[in-house]
Amino acid sequence: MALPPYDPNFTLAFSYGRRDNVFENDPEHDESASAAIVAVELISSARLALKLDSVRTEYSAQYLVDKAGSRNLRRRRKLTVKDCLNFALKKGGIPRAEDWPPLGSESKTPSSYEPALVSMKGEVIEPKDMDEVPELLVHQSAVGAKLHVFTPHIELQQDAIYLPRQVSMRATLDLEMG
């Protein structure tokens, strides 16, 4: 998926608070859309690395928002990357970007329209702790990571990296070497 042009007015979408009382800072940029973009980028990277696609292929993030997102409306929560990947695998695939309206498009496809799906199979693996991560990195073709950024702590550390107490020294060394 091609990156959008630089927008100096863009602000990151984030939420804070308990799950039943979530506050968002940017109504224009949605968490679910961001998760769908990351998911299709992971899918594209994995398919290219496994030589299932001969060139980098753009897949439809909007399809994931429309289809996987409609399942989450009943539960009233935002999509995550894991939700998007699980949906694509359960569905058996997702369409290419050109076969579905672009992300953020107001136009909707007719309910009877069924695009050709590019077949997908695999599994979403989430490690329980940092000790499982090196094993996954060796054996998996595409890896996504959730990064928590603590801006106030970075500023307090004079631009150094903040490491919470829960992170082991071994994990710190692996990150520095990797």
UniProtKB/Swiss-Prot annotation:
Entry GO terms, CC: cytoplasm; nucleus
Keywords per UniProt: Cytoplasm, Nucleus
InterPro entries to which the protein is assigned, alphabetical: Papain-like_cys_pep_sf
Leader sequence segment: none
Subcellular localization, as worded in the UniProt entry: Cytoplasm; Nucleus
Domain of life: Eukaryota
Expression across tissues: Expressed in seedlings, leaves, stems, inflorescences and siliques.
Induction: Target of TAS1 (trans-acting siRNA precursor 1)-derived small interfering RNAs in response to temperature variations. Up-regulated by cold (at 4 degrees Celsius). Highly up-regulated in seedlings exposed to heat shock.
Key word Nucleus present: yes
Biological process (GO), any one: response to heat
Role, per record: Mediates both basal and acquired thermotolerance. Involved in the mechanisms necessary for quick response to heat and subsequent heritable transgenerational memory of heat acclimation (global warming) such as early flowering and attenuated immunity; this process includes epigenetic regulation as well as post-transcriptional gene silencing (PTGS).
Record family assignment: Belongs to the heat induced plant HTT protein family.
Name the UniProt record assigns to this protein: Protein HEAT-INDUCED TAS1 TARGET 5
Organism: Arabidopsis thaliana
